[in-house]
UniProtKB/Swiss-Prot annotation:
Residues 68-87 are annotated as: Disordered. Probable heavy-metal-binding protein. It comes from Arabidopsis thaliana. InterPro entries: HIPP (IPR051863), HMA_dom (IPR006121). Residues 69-86 have a biased composition (Basic and acidic residues). Residues 1-65 form the HMA domain. This is Heavy metal-associated isoprenylated plant protein 12.
Length: 118
């Protein structure tokens, strides 16, 4: 990531918008900002390609090219309190009902000499 700051010689709002739209369509551009005649472009970009495209629209000069400045991390003034871990949630599952056994009443003769009709 790098920041490219360019000085643009723009006289009207239309030229300013055209310059912004030209830079926005380049690959690798993350953000574009125009303030007081300065164009700030952030992203993985080639500064030479930006100037080459903008020279067709208006007079362009380099002001600076450099890496993105990361915001300073503030150190916490208060000491960190130890985080209390919430108790583990225990789920009580109801065991399934035991299977129901069906009694099969088979038919059989107790009299071995019974008559069988065929």
């Amino acid at each position: 990531m790098q920041v490219v700051v360019l000085k643009l010689d723009v006289h009207c709002e239309k030229t300013k918008q055209k310059a912004m739209s030209t830079v926005c369509c380049l690959s690798g551009v993350n953000s574009v900002e125009v303030k007081d005649g300065k164009l700030t472009v952030t992203g993985e970009i080639d500064a030479y390609m930006i100037v080459k495209k903008l020279k067709k629209i208006c007079h362009t000069e380099f002001i600076s090219v450099g890496p993105v400045k990361e915001p300073e991390k503030k150190k916490p003034d208060d000491p960190k309190k130890p985080e209390t871990k919430p108790p583990d949630v225990i789920y009580h599952y109801v065991p399934p009902c035991p299977p129901y056994y069906h009694n099969f009443n088979g038919c059989y003769n107790e009299d071995p000499n019974a008559c069988v009709t065929s």
